[in-house]
Amino acid sequence: SSDLTVSKFYEPGAFAEFFSGSFTFIADAIDSTPSKVDLLLECVQRDIPVISSMGTGNKLDPTYLAVEDISGTSVCPLARSVRKQLRAAGVKKGVTVVYSKEPVQRAEAGEVPGSMVFVPASAGLLMASYIVRQIIAENS
C-alpha cells in the first residue's frame, strides 16, 4: 500500500521491543544478516517456532526453492553466512528455512542483487504453507 510507512526495522537486541506475549510461529524475511541471525537466535532460545527466508536475489526459477533445516542448506550464500553465525553461537540445527538451490548468479560489482517478484513471493507462499501445516499437525 502506498499509505504504509515503515518506521522501524528489526535490529539486533530489539526482540523485546517487537515481540511481546506469546507466538504460535514467526516468519522471518529480514534482509540484514545481523538482524536475521539475532531474531533466529532469540526464537531458538525462547523455543518459538520460526521459519526464515534465505536469499532470493538474482534468482529466476521458483522451482528450485526448498524448505529444509539450516544445517542441510547448500548453494545459497545467505544461508551459508547465517548457518556459520548460528553455529558460532552454538546452534547447529533446528532452524527451518526456505532457500533456493538455483545456481548462484553473481551480480555485477556494485550492483544490488535483483529479484523477479515471483521468486520471493513463492518463498513467502512456501513459508505460509509450512506454518499452516505445522500448526495443523501440532493440533491433530
What are these language model-derived features?
Residues 21-22, 32-35, 45, 50, ...:
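Glycine-rich phosphate/adenylate-binding loop
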Residues 15-21:
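Short, well-structured alpha-helical segments in soluble
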Residues 6-15:
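Conserved SAM/SAH-binding loop
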Residues 13, 60-61, 105-107:
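Generic structural signal for helix capping and beta-alpha/helix-loop junctions
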Residues 9, 54, 101:
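Residues at the C-termini of beta-strands that transition into short coil/loop
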Residues 25-70:
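ADP-ribose/adenylate-binding Rossmann-like module
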Residues 4-6, 27, 51, 96-98:
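Hydrophobic/aromatic beta-strand patches that form the interior of the parallel beta-sheet core
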